[in-house]
Amino acid sequence: MKVLGIDPSTKTGWALITITDARWSHMSGVQILRGTGFQRVVYAKKWLEEFVHSHTPNLIVIEGYAYANPHTLGTLVEVGTAFRLGMSEEGFGWIDCPPTTLKKFVCGKGTAKKEHILLDVYKHWKVSF
């Protein structure tokens, strides 16, 4: 089974976990979405479509929107919509995961800071990013 997690932004973080029998491996990275406005939307959609076709995940999880910074919300919605539109057009399903749900799963509370999340991921699964 392959699970792809995506944190959509102009610097999109991603992690692909592969589980085979009782073993698992992972790869992760950051994809910088170049351009502005519609140019960036087209690039984002195409990048994710190509990534998904080359890695064929069984499950795609996209982090939902965070509303903390109103100055970046428009860009985040553009990128997130491009990803969701691309997955829909290509016939891939996905799950939206609110940021607070992810934080609560990893740290036990939905308001954890990024540094705390990274530390808890390492403590629980011995993986660092």
Mark where each language-model region is.
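Phosphate- and other anionic-substrate recognition elements at nucleic-acid/protein interfaces
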Residues: M1-F129
